[in-house]
């Protein structure tokens, strides 16, 4: 039996005239049919994840396919029991994924319609994973990798996508002369980043067409060689990919035990995404460090209406005090 909610993940690099007005009109339509989700619109295209009941999502797909240049836009569809979003946002941005090349003095931005890596099918990508002479690079953020990743893939030490070009330049000697294939959640980041690799002089660059989401749904590979879960930017947080031999790779921030539950650090000025159990979240006041645990704006403390005495008691249980610097 089909589940009542569909989640649509999609993007398309396509020139959009008067993109700011397009975003406003798009938001009005989405609200008129009761759709929920998050969509970014830029002069270079559109990138979104939305959710709704079957009829609602069908209306939306029909609407998008009626727009100029979007007739062949590819929707990746998941069925879920509950909505993946609480509200509807459509925002105009400079880029639909922020690689930030111009911000970081990496010359001009990349247009994936002109320069991008070769598309690899799930089977071709699986073959690349098994090839010892191929470098497989995860283009996502560190916390996404830590929840789940392809077996043997390189983990760049980055907290956001715009840090990736500098990381690659810092490690250029390690794989400049090798075949490099990249992957991301749904493909939108790889379209642009693989193009940047080509411009940097890498001779053999490939990308997983349709991203991890498509790999997990492919009837031939069935998500094999993916370890852990896939981080998604909605209420679901994590979804399954490997339907052959799934394992847990996530580790609890505090004690290193297997964990696939993400929370944001209680300190709003840190907001680091950390994997932790409910027990350790309570034990460590959802703070990723002592400084965050004792921060006066710690959201865990306020959300649970903890008194100062209760905070002191929990800190003492882990050998800490209210001092900013732990003993």
UniProtKB/Swiss-Prot annotation:
The keyword Oxidoreductase applies. The active site is at 184 (cysteine persulfide intermediate). Gene3D superfamilies: 3.30.70.100, Rhodanese-like domain. The keyword DNA-binding does not apply. Keywords: Oxidoreductase, tRNA processing. GO terms for molecular function: oxidoreductase activity, acting on paired donors, with incorporation or reduction of molecular oxygen. It is an enzyme of class 1 (oxidoreductase). Residues 130-224 form the Rhodanese domain. Pfam families: Rhodanese (PF00581), Rhodanese_C (PF12368), UPF0176_N (PF17773). Its EC number is 1.14.-.-. GO terms for biological process: tRNA modification. Coiled coil: none annotated. It catalyses: uridine(34) in tRNA + AH2 + O2 = 5-hydroxyuridine(34) in tRNA + A + H2O. PANTHER family: RHODANESE-LIKE DOMAIN-CONTAINING PROTEIN 7-RELATED, THIOSULFATE SULFURTRANSFERASE/RHODANESE-LIKE DOMAIN-CONTAINING PROTEIN 2. Belongs to the TrhO family. Catalyzes oxygen-dependent 5-hydroxyuridine (ho5U) modification at position 34 in tRNAs. This is tRNA uridine(34) hydroxylase. It comes from Streptococcus thermophilus (strain ATCC BAA-250 / LMG 18311). The gene is trhO.
């Amino acid at each position: 039996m089909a589940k009542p909610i569909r989640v649509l993940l999609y993007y398309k690099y396509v020139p959009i005239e008067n993109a700011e007005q397009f975003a406003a009109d798009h938001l009005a339509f989405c609200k008129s049919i009761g759709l929920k989700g998050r969509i970014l619109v830029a002069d270079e295209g559109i990138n979104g994840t939305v959710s709704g009941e079957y009829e609602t999502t069908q209306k939306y797909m029909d609407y998008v396919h009626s727009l100029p240049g979007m007739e062949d836009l590819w929707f990746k569809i998941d069925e879920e029991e509950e909505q993946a979003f609480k509200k509807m946002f459509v925002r105009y941005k400079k880029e639909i994924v922020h690689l930030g090349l111009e911000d970081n003095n990496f010359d001009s931005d990349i247009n994936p319609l002109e320069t991008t890596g070769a598309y690899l099918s799930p089977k071709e990508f699986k073959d690349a994973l098994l090839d010892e002479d191929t470098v497989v690079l995860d283009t996502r953020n560190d916390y996404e990798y830590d929840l789940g990743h392809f077996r043997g893939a390189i983990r760049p030490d980055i907290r956001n996508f715009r840090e990736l070009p500098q990381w690659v330049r810092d490690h250029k000697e390690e794989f400049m002369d090798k075949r490099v294939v990249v992957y991301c959640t749904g493909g939108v980041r790889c379209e642009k980043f693989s193009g940047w690799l080509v411009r940097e002089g890498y001779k053999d660059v490939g990308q997983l067409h349709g991203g991890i989401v498509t790999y997990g749904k492919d009837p031939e590979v069935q998500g094999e060689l993916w370890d852990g879960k896939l981080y998604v930017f909605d209420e679901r947080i994590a979804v399954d990919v490997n339907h052959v031999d799934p394992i847990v790779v996530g580790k609890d921030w505090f004690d290193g035990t297997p964990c696939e539950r993400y929370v944001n650090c209680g300190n709003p000025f840190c907001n680091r995404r950390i994997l932790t159990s409910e027990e350790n979240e309570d034990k460590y006041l959802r703070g990723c460090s002592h400084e965050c645990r004792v921060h006066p704006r710690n959201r865990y403390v306020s959300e649970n209406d903890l008194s100062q005495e209760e905070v002191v008691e929990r800190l003492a249980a882990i050998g800490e005090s209210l001092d900013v610097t732990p003993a």
